[in-house]
């Protein structure tokens, strides 16, 4: 996640957007797993059924770890959900493992009709896991494998990490932005998100579509500058982010579906749901249906 102090943007607006209906509250939700306690197919399907109460689209992060790609695709297909299949590529060896897993799933005969795209890496340039030319090469190789079947290819990274050599290989861009890690007040969080989208990413997109792949606010944990983690602030940021992205016709995959207690500190508290799949106390479907900003 992004930990960069940048700008404060204060905009005072109050508006109501068109209400969403059950299953369409979010464009999508991010779904992570504990790699040290691999979930079964039944567990993944059960998680997806809970997610489906709020969206019909999910995004995963790895093909090979815990066989997540194959299991998640199977669950999504059975439930009729759309899915972004992620590839984790922190090293060359990991990329080869992810490519092998993706190839195996494609050769298995599984339907890819509900696959929105393959996401080749998550914040790899931000973390300096690889360089821009290597990432562009990875994206090209994945594209050669999946584009003949009509599947799009992209990468997800922080809003300032989209060099031209990478953008040239993408079908569309996916932007991560976490105003919490920028130390802004929650009141300025969602407007900061939209500012990054408009000023930082659209100008680098070469006219290609841009979507938000990760954003959110934690309900617990240490503060970061003026960013305060609390249930009330998670609620406010979520409402503002939903409202502004709908108002601006921006597709946003919210981070995240569930709290992840296997992670340390504040990283464990970004879900809209508790680990057992119950909605957090301060959140509600009425908020999701009618967010304000």
PLM features per residue range, with description:
Residues 20-23, 47-53, 67-82, 101-114, ...:
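Acidic (Asp/Glu)-rich catalytic clusters
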Residues 223-230, 244-293:
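Aromatic-rich peripheral "rim/lid" segments of glycoside hydrolase catalytic domains that contact
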Residues 116, 122, 157-196, 211, ...:
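Aromatic- and acid-rich polysaccharide-binding/catalytic face
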Residues 32-36, 41, 63, 68-152:
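Substrate-binding cleft of extracellular glycoside hydrolase catalytic domains
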Residues 27-31, 56-60, 83-86, 116-120, ...:
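Hydrophobic faces of well-ordered beta-strands that scaffold small-molecule active sites
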Residues 20-57, 64:
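Boundary/entry segment of secreted carbohydrate-active catalytic domains
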Residues 177-181, 206-234, 258-263, 268:
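Active-site clefts of carbohydrate-active enzymes
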Residues 143-163, 208-215, 251-262:
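Aromatic-lined carbohydrate-recognition surfaces of secreted/lumenal glycan-active proteins
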């Amino acid at each position: 996640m992004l930990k960069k102090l940048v700008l404060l943007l204060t905009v005072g607006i109050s508006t109501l957007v068109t209400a969403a209906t059950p299953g369409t509250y979010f464009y999508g939700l991010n779904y992570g797993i504990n790699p040290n306690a691999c979930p079964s197919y039944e567990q993944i399907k059960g998680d997806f059924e809970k997610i489906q109460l709020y969206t019909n689209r999910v995004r995963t992060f790895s093909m090979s770890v815990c066989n997540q790609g194959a299991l998640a695709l199977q669950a999504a297909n059975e439930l009729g959900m759309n899915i972004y299949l992620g590839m984790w590529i922190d090293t060359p060896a990991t990329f080869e493992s992810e490519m092998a897993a993706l190839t195996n799933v494609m050769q298995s005969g599984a339907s890819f009709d509900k696959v929105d795209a393959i996401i080749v890496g998550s914040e790899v340039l931000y973390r300096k896991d690889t360089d821009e030319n290597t990432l562009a090469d990875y994206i090209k190789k994945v594209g050669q494998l999946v584009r003949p079947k009509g599947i799009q290819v992209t990468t997800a990274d922080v809003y300032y990490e989209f060099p031209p050599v990478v953008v040239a290989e993408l079908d569309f861009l996916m932007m991560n932005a976490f105003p919490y890690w920028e130390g802004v007040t929650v009141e300025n969080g969602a407007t900061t998100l939209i500012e990054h989208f408009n000023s930082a990413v659209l100008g680098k997109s070469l006219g290609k579509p841009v979507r938000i792949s990760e954003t959110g606010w934690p309900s617990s944990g240490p503060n970061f500058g003026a960013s305060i983690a609390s249930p009330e602030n998670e609620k406010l940021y979520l409402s503002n982010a939903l409202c502004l992205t709908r108002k601006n016709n921006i597709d946003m995959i919210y981070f995240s579906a569930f709290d992840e207690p296997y992670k340390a500190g504040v990283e464990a508290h970004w879900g809209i749901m508790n680990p057992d799949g119950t909605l957090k106390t301060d959140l509600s479907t009425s908020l999701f249906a009618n967010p304000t900003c």
